[in-house]
């Protein structure tokens, strides 16, 4: 069964074609800068990485270009569109409407659109991908896999905000959490890797990259997570502020006469590592600047790492302990110094990092704690596309995802 996995952003489409029975990636790549004059497609072909300029005006055009590439004589891996059995979509926000992946139909589409209000930056472009497939491959079944679904097992005490209750009852204002597909994958995979059952295990999954979130997973279920109504809450991120006093935002809005749109832009695109360091949102560039003595770069790294440590400690307390800590995401998988600095203050909980194993690990599955550590600390590369493909396969075959 060949499953095309799509992740549509505002000006991009990432794709992966997976032969799911054999767990084999047939093709992967992405189109960027949709609607701009310098739009391009990049993809892997054998051991080569290829980039080509394209004239692409919208997501329909982008998906047509992807399908043309998949069936081209020069770079294709399939002969005909009919070899695509299903399409799995990453959908960012499912609100309280979806607690698992679903077959996309008119009713599901209507519910995705109902979430536009709480996910204005993400759901409309996810929907554009669904619409594009409906236009280009109308006979192919589609499945929606929601970032928020894994977190629907959180109890009310974890997801409610201490605001007047009517805003939850009438407007759905609550914590939803994100990166759920990644947290679900790594929390399951780490148990397979260690040869243990999820039942009875307390796991903290740290998805740390340009965006970042942490989830408390107990008995295989999410019971709390750091992101909130939107992906802005929680950790300090590349350009997102994470946790901040709402009073500080109101103060700035009043003093500088900022609109809600201005503030949305500030907390999402001008803050975080980039905002504090003044260097970049790229961890590699900030680390290089810090090594050269840039004080704001040093401060931004210290803030970034401290906030991860705080959430790990808080979630360990919430669960009454922790058995496994997992690092994933671009920084979590590849930045050994971040992992070490996050875990160092956790020694009081019995966390002991094996410095040699940690330094040697650059994105491979592996244990980076010592044999004597009371808590297993493990690096697990995330694979959201695989998870989306597996859910799609299950639904197409009539099984529970």
Located regions from the model:
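Glycine-rich phosphate-binding loop of actin/hexokinase-like ATP-binding domains
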Residues: 150-255
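Phosphate/pyrophosphate-binding loops at sites that engage ATP/ADP/AMP, CoA/4′-phosphopantetheine
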Residues: 69-84, 190-197, 312-323
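Glycine-rich beta-strand-to-loop/alpha-helix junction loops that act as flexible
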Residues: 9, 89-92, 208-210, 322, ...
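Adenine-nucleotide phosphate-binding core of ATP-dependent small-molecule kinases
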Residues: 265, 272-276, 283-318
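Catalytic phosphate/nucleotide-handling subdomain of diverse soluble enzymes
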Residues: 218, 223-259, 265, 329-360
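N-terminal glycine/serine-rich phosphate-binding loop of ATP-dependent small-molecule kinases
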Residues: 1-95
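Internal helix-turn-beta structural module
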Residues: 298, 302-322, 326, 332-401
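Short beta-strand-loop/turn "lid" adjacent to the catalytic site in phosphate-handling enzymes
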Residues: 70, 74-122, 143, 149-158
């Amino acid at each position: 069964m060949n499953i095309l996995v799509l992740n549509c952003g505002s000006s991009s489409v990432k794709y992966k074609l997976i032969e799911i029975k054999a767990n084999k990636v047939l093709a992967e790549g992405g189109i960027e800068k949709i609607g701009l004059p310098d739009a391009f497609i990049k993809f892997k072909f054998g051991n080569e990485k290829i980039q080509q300029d394209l004239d692409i005006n919208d997501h329909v055009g982008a998906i047509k270009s992807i399908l043309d590439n998949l069936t081209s004589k020069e770079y294709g891996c399939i002969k005909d569109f009919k070899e695509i059995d299903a399409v799995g979509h990453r959908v960012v926000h499912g609100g309280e409407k979806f607690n698992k992946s679903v077959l996309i139909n008119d009713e599901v589409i209507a519910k995705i659109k109902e979430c536009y209000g709480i996910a204005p930056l993400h759901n409309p472009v996810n929907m554009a991908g669904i619409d594009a497939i409906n236009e280009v491959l109308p006979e192919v079944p589609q499945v929606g896999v929601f970032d928020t679904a894994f977190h629907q097992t959180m109890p009310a005490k974890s997801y409610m905000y201490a605001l007047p209750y009517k805003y939850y009852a009438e407007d759905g204002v609550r914590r939803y959490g994100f990166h759920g597909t990644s947290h679900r994958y790594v929390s399951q995979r780490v148990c397979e890797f260690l040869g243990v059952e999820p039942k009875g295990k307390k796991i903290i999954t740290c998805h740390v990259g340009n965006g970042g979130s942490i989830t408390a997973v107990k008995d295989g279920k999410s019971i709390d997570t750091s992101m909130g109504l939107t992906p802005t809450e929680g950790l300090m991120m590349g350009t997102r502020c994470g946790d901040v006093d709402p009073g500080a935002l109101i103060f700035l809005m009043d003093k500088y006469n900022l609109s809600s749109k201005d503030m949305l832009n500030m907390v999402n695109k001008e803050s975080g590592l980039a905002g504090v360091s003044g260097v970049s949102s790229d961890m590699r560039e900030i680390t290089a600047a810090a090594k050269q003595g840039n004080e704001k770069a040093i401060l931004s790294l210290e803030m970034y790492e401290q906030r991860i440590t705080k959430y790990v400690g808080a979630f360990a307390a919430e669960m009454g302990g922790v058995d496994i800590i997992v690092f994933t995401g671009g920084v979590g998988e590849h930045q050994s110094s971040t992992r070490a600095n996050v875990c160092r203050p956790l020694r009081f909980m019995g966390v002991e990092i094996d410095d040699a194993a940690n330094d040697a690990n650059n994105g491979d599955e592996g244990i980076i704690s010592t044999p004597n550590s009371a808590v297993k600390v493990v690096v697990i590369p995330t694979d959201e596309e695989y998870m989306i493909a597996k859910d799609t396969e299950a639904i197409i075959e009539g099984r529970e995802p």
